[in-house]
Curated annotation (Swiss-Prot):
Database matches in InterPro entries: Asp/Orn_carbamoyltranf_P-bd, Asp/Orn_carbamoylTrfase, Asp/Orn_carbamoylTrfase_sf, Asp_carbamoyltransf, Asp_carbamoyltransf_Asp/Orn-bd
Pfam families, per the entry: OTCace, OTCace_N
Catalytic reaction(s) noted: carbamoyl phosphate + L-aspartate = N-carbamoyl-L-aspartate + phosphate + H(+)
Top class in the EC scheme: transferase
Family in the record: Belongs to the aspartate/ornithine carbamoyltransferase superfamily. ATCase family.
Pathway terms, separated by semicolons: Pyrimidine metabolism; UMP biosynthesis via de novo pathway; (S)-dihydroorotate from bicarbonate: step 2/3
A GO CC term assigned to this protein in UniProt: cytosol
Taxonomic lineage: Bacteria, Pseudomonadati, Pseudomonadota, Betaproteobacteria, Burkholderiales
Record's keyword annotation contains Transferase: yes
EC number in record: 2.1.3.2
Keywords for the protein's UniProt record, in alphabetical order: Pyrimidine biosynthesis, Transferase
Annotated protein name in UniProt: Aspartate carbamoyltransferase catalytic subunit
Assembly with partners or alone: Heterododecamer (2C3:3R2) of six catalytic PyrB chains organized as two trimers (C3), and six regulatory PyrI chains organized as three dimers (R2).
Encoding gene (name): pyrB
Residues bound to carbamoyl phosphate: 76-77, 126, 156, 159, 285-286
Amino acid sequence: MSSENNAGANLVNQFNAAGELTHLLTLEGLPKEQILHILDTAQQFVSVTDPSREVKKVPLLRGKSVFNLFFENSTRTRTTFEIAAKRLSADVINLDISTSSTAKGESLLDTIDNLVAMQADIFVVRHSVSRAPIEIANHVPTHVHVVNAGDGSHQHPTQGLLDMYTMRHFKQNFKGLKVAIVGDIVHSRVAKSNIHALTTLGCEDIRVIGPESLLPSDLDMLGVKVYHSMEEGLKDVDVVMTLRIQKERMEAGQVPEGDAFFNQYGLTPTRLALAKSDAIVMHPGPMNRGVEIDSVVADGPQSVILNQVTFGIAVRMAVMSIVAGN
């Protein structure tokens, strides 16, 4: 994991010459002040998404064009980015990858060049290839902005930010917080983004729990505590985040059996009881009920999974607003 992240960090330039955030590509190395600025800005946008508000829009991106380029499937991320852009009054174009010229062999950067020629202002990019959004950001003109919506198993910065927002909302601060991330860590861009953000924000007790086959070999370099037992790893934690098994990133024969995984690592009410009584349960989605999480827990009073989705709109509004210069 570290080799991939370090390689990515060497290629990333998220700031312009004036020191302003112009792309959001990774949370690795993003300063604490910048993360807090995004979270604070998102907090201001929460009121825009309030159901009681008659007009759920602000004009910050009026006249701007946001292109959603999703080369991997998505429900929550793509939809909340679209909602966020529209609530900022942007024009939103969702490129249908299956019918675009990339399906005919056009290169990624040639596609980008053509969309820039159509006056694109912001690209929101999800791609199966790690660091593809970084390649795009290094290629586009300086007036065009790129937001990474998840690249391979590398990073998912806006998911990490909305997770930080959720934790801060329910737990107020990160100092003294105990966070457990459970499941398929080795393939998870969400886990990597969360670990980087939590470390930057001062969380000193980050735990990862899973079978050895689903944990990167170099986790100790990130300063996290590694557990192979739920009973040990969940003791007295404030936050439990479960992750799905990413079968699409595994070779044949590597995929754990769902029942066997659930029996050992599924988040059940009994296991959740090992955490603090006011612990919150998080999941970036999509959930596989009965594999990494019990429905009783997913739908229970400690679950903030749907809050994550709601907060994601405000966080993505904040990110697009900030990179566009607001």
